[in-house]
Amino acid sequence: MSYQPHYFQEVRKAQQESYSPYSQFKVGAYLKTKDGRTFYGTNVENASYPLSICAERAILVSAISQGYRPGDFESITVTVDADKPSSPCGACRQVLKELCDDDMPVYMTNHKGDMVMMTVAELLPFGFSGKDLE
């Protein structure tokens, strides 16, 4: 699946819903499933920072809560208001590894429309998964 220009407009819509009163770092996420459904997510901060949730995890949890399962996802697009695209944090990379195919594209954009694409495996090389627990 290749990046589609409308992904940028969609992810920017999600970003506007960010609840980030402490950092003012608004993150939006747009998830496309293999059956064509779309989900929107955003970061939600908490005064106790560790309790905050990132847009990437919020969107994946939403999709799982609505019946989707690991491997059902086609791509995720994430955007930030920064000079360059920002990559998912370590916790989000681990959740992507758990719920998404290794070759799933992760499109990272910024407010200018710059885009970088990496696969889940590229974002978390030598990632830990359930297979490691067998």
Residue ranges of model-derived segments:
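C-terminal binding/interaction regions
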Residues: S2-S20, G71-E134
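Short, solvent-exposed cationic patches
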Residues: C54-E74
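Short beta-strand scaffold segments in enzyme catalytic cores
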Residues: Q24-T33, Y107
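Amphipathic coiled-coil signal-relay and dimerization helices
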Residues: F39-T42, M117
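A generic structural signal for short beta-strands and their flanking turns/coil linkers
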Residues: F25-V27, Y40, D72-E74
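Compact, glycine-rich, soluble single-domain proteins
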Residues: N43-A58
